[in-house]
């Protein structure tokens, strides 16, 4: 109470000058309590307080009191550095558990200071001394967090301060270690900017996981993939595959599918090759495995497995354990090679194809034949719309129209088949046989269709080119025609994506050095595709040639190729990025923007964002500025909500190139999300005054809205109508019309069963998808590169698999209204001669007669009112019957309207599950199958709880659904084609497509 009556600290301050130590101690003790109120007055005596702290004759406690008082005064004065310095001197009197602004502020300052010093100590070779008192404060704070059960806070501080020992302590002491580890993995991906340090954190997490009684092998293998340690993954898979427990084998298959989702092909091949072959087995066992694998459709993986297993002399004693391991190993290798998932995806897209051919027919009819840009755009849209479905009905039905494509349009038309048949690994070459170079170069066919066919082969085998690489190399070597070289280079780059094959590199380099502009551009891009993410020294060789050549096309191809080589290298690419962004040639600087985007792709790194924003507003070249803004989309796709906010001002720029870049940046980073802010930003750009800005905005809007239904966002329906209006408008400029046609294809991509996804479920970059969108964005200069968007397509499917990797039928539930996620309704033909329903004409004489009859009926009813009840009832029923006859149709309509929509939907495996639907997916309680991991989509291994009951399988070899759904009046014409296609088994050897008969130009 006495303290509340004090009006000045003057008396206590005077006591500080007293000679007796006990008086000084008394003064300090009371000033500490009053400092919050009287700090302005106390601040005049700071020198005295400081001298007391420095006086060695004082005992430790008194000096610490003086330090704490000085710290608080400096805090109120805003001198945080001095305040922290004296707080360190206060020792244990600085109580980290106190709940006050002073403590919170200084703790934040201390942690920041400590984190900076720790980072500097690691990053620089110099020895950085850290005040042990600062270390003590941070450690006290960490210990307090762990003691209080604030484990996430402790982990955040430990990661920021690079205290991995404290991080491990926080994880181990937490109540839910598995949940804490998952949180820590997410934090390391989201907030740890430095690649090397992130790897240290992940390595620690792997060690903690492995010490657990029941390790989470799914998470361990994901961490090992981030660390690029294939041997660790192979060891875990071998252990699970050799286990006697069937569930462990299912877990191994699930891990393999999860790794394949990340599309890191070189890593997967390394894991596959490290899996040890079974020990010597009898011939009978080998035959059994081969029979089993033939049923599993993993032909390429199986052949390798059979080759690797040497044929021994017949052993009389069969080792059943090894036989089981051999069978499981074959399945695992088939999954890791990607063939199993590709085959299942192909069958799913084929059997669930819901593409609307009437949309394409409308586009075709509205496009003027002499407008080659829109003609080609229609071919692109068809390929994208049917990507991976193997349905080429539209092309077959319009051969005359298609044959009008000449030169590069012919190249694109043929290459489009590669997108339609993407993943058809077994029959890819036979499908393209009619268009491929026959008997070496100049075999008599059109070089444009031959080049397009080689490009198509690359698209079919993208990232899985083992079986086609040699053929593409031979085709490249045996021709000197630049168009064929162009197609062969692109195809080879796709087939050998990220393999860094020296022989292929030399073949492509020899094409580059011919200095042909057309072939050289493709060669530059192809080199980048081949060397994706290798950060190789060859980049400097490519850069040197880019400076030597005079062809802009070659420089641009090389600039993009160099950018591809530094994919995912983060700070390791800074030297090359600096070199490219400072170059005098704007095309090299343009490549530097892509290098910056790809090196930091998906990291949301602040340094990269700052650099890109700087170039977006300061570079003298419009191309560089446009690309700098576009590149933001690649850096930010892991945090799509940020992109519209960051580029919102740029989308209102006076420069149309910057506006275009802003549109595509949003399209890339928010693809498939249906994000409301993204749509709001793009809407005004779709009606921009500049044609190419409208084009970019329409394409970006389609990318954002893919797999979003009109029921979940009404703007989707409005956008579809806007596209139709632009396409049908004869006065619309070509650029906008092309954008609208492409947008129509992207909206309904892959038979309306795919979305664009750049991150896998485990937050790993999908390499192929990111590279695909990067090269797709080059269509500004070269339209055939539009097809690269197909690499970013990811099926929106739940595909449950049993132990035999077959798809059993079982039901699960979507706890949401079916209309929210249903397919778009098929378009209908608008008939002009539909008779409008008009009111019936009534003559005046008829009206008078009806009125008179009604009046007589009323009088008669009154007269008979006293009559018997039966007669009354009959009259009433007759009247009711008459009324019901008149309003029969109306009543039926009302009944239909009244019926409420179901609040859930039963789905059958395999089912279409769009990203926004995943949170509503629930399994039935009495289900026969239980998933190995709770995943609402993708490939999910199922444990059979009733293995003795017979199974009903889905996705059989010959899907019963029609390959090309007929729409409206086209049904009769398509029936025969559809029946033929549906009867054809995907795995059977199909007849090659009919050759397109092009009219000679």
From Swiss-Prot:
Q: Which GO terms describe its molecular function?
A: enzyme regulator activity
> Where can the Glycyl lysine isopeptide (Lys-Gly) (interchain with G-Cter in ubiquitin) cross-link be found?
166
The segments carrying the PC repeats are 412-447, 452-485, 487-521, 522-555, 557-590, 591-626, 627-659, 661-695, 696-736, 739-771
Name a single GO cellular component.
proteasome complex
* A Gene Ontology biological process term: regulation of protein catabolic process
Provide ranges: composition bias, Low complexity. 961-985
Any matching Pfam family = RPN2_N
Q: Could you tell me which residues carry N-acetylalanine?
A: 2
InterPro entries per UniProt: 26S_Psome_Rpn2, ARM-like, ARM-type_fold, Proteasome/cyclosome_rpt, PSMD1_RPN2_N, RPN2_C
Signal peptide (residue range): none
Q: Indicate, by first and last residue, each region the UniProt record lists as having compositional bias (Basic and acidic residues).
A: 854-863
Give the modified residues of type Phosphoserine.
889
Ranges for the region named Disordered are 853-896, 954-1001
* Key words of the record: Acetylation, Isopeptide bond, Phosphoprotein, Proteasome, Repeat, Ubl conjugation
Q: Which PANTHER family match?
A: 26S PROTEASOME NON-ATPASE REGULATORY SUBUNIT, 26S PROTEASOME NON-ATPASE REGULATORY SUBUNIT 1
Family statement: Belongs to the proteasome subunit S1 family.
Self-association or partners: how does it assemble? Component of the 19S regulatory particle (RP/PA700) base subcomplex of the 26S proteasome. The 26S proteasome is composed of a core protease (CP), known as the 20S proteasome, capped at one or both ends by the 19S regulatory particle (RP/PA700). The RP/PA700 complex is composed of at least 17 different subunits in two subcomplexes, the base and the lid, which form the portions proximal and distal to the 20S proteolytic core, respectively.
Its function, per the record, reads: Acts as a regulatory subunit of the 26 proteasome which is involved in the ATP-dependent degradation of ubiquitinated proteins.
Which protein are we looking at?
A: 26S proteasome non-ATPase regulatory subunit 1 homolog B
Name the gene behind this protein.
RPN2B
